[in-house]
Amino acid sequence: MNDSVEIRSLQKLRKRDIAALSDVLIDCVEGGASVSFMLPLSQEKAQAYWRRMAASAARGERIIFLAEDAAGTLVGTVQLVLDVPENQPHRAEVAKMLVHRRARRQGVGAALLSAVERAALAAHRTLLVLDTVTGDDGFRLYSRHGWQRCGEIPGYALWPDGRLCSTTVFYKQLPSA
């Protein structure tokens, strides 16, 4: 783990958090990440998304993690979605792993992933699932950290420029307490 990165969970939404989260999201989309948004992504749309996610976190439906560099600048985020059907209380979903392009390949994604896994165990969730663009940076990150591939779905989503892309579904079984 990168010692110059601090991971914290979003406890209370501050105006600066919304702006910083929006900047990371926009940077990722402008860099070509297929993360549910199309180009161009406005600040207003990005901020509205983060307000919805913060409200969901306040209801206990998800935990939003923030990664800050040594200067206190937000450089990444990920979500642990706990709101699952009642017959799946052992499961959670990992969503929106976003790392600003200037902070990639510095251990930020790995630190966020580690925080998500610890929080999942604390919430008694032993099965994590996610999907990511086949072959992208996230795909390699999850593969390196023990996640198992279930399969690929061709033409699942769109790149921000409108082209189709495939997704790969991953899971990770965590040790039960």
Locate each region found by the language model:
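Acetyl-CoA-dependent GNAT
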Residues: 12-96, 100-102, 113-115, 119, ...
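Active-site-proximal loop/turn and secondary-structure-junction residues that shape catalytic pockets
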Residues: 98, 134-136
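Conserved short alpha-helix immediately C-terminal to the canonical SAM/SAH-binding motif I
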Residues: 112, 136-138
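Conserved GNAT acetyl-CoA-binding A-motif
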Residues: 113, 120-132
